[in-house]
Amino acid sequence: MKGAILALSLCLCGITAAQEAPAPAAPAEFSEAERDQQLLDSYAAQPTLENAARILGLASLDDENGTYRMGFCSQLIRQHSVHLNELLEKAGGADSPAIRLHICTCCWLADTPESNKAAATILKYDPIIEAWSRIKPGTPKPDFTKLEELTSEPMEAMALDMAWGAYDATRRRDILSSFIRCGTRTAAPEKPRKLWMVTDEQRARAAKAPNGIDVVSMAAKWSVQSRAKADAAFAAEVQACLSTMPADVQNRWKAPLPDYPQNESEYTPNPE
């Protein structure tokens, strides 16, 4: 999940320590990352076209939260699909290949008639993006392109990140329920579908997992429970979702997470 770093600098000057107490510290300026995060956090309550455009213009695939933001932005593209041309114009980023690639990817994932047309247009007139994205106009779309497949039950770590982005953009209870299903499943998928934008190097790293451990399931459960501890309103949403689920799911949710080996020698690459 996401986090923020707060930096505070203070310089005090007084006549004497006995005569004058230190003045209150001036409020620190928010960092750019914190301002971006505040915009993301407040979007679900104010899903306006203007806020959507600001968020869409923020992110790139090179960002450390890039996959989270892809899920987030794919959802807001869906919300404003009727006004997509205006949204993309407001988002800007014409001089940034990274942002154009990010927008193109999000349009594919959103999978609406308007967003598919926008993605095809970007690819047709932007040879740099065509080369980066490894998609050529007129070829079939990648197999893994729809938000429903990201959010129905995340099967890869990057899909889980994207699903969290889609949830934070909408606060949809069905997505939260999918995290609970993922966190309580009794077996990992035999052949999880792969995200087309994941590089071979990223996939090789993600394939390393301890024997018998469904790391995505663990991550889903840990991330929900961690947020619930810090956010009472979110905790209430979790309980509302759990109350609709079978007793065995509720019991597995209450069970402690298994120990996760810390020694890399205990990791065994999963078969492709």
Where on the chain are the PLM-derived regions?
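Bacterial N-terminal signal peptides
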Residues: 4-14
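Non-catalytic all-alpha helical scaffold/repeat segments
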Residues: 19-272
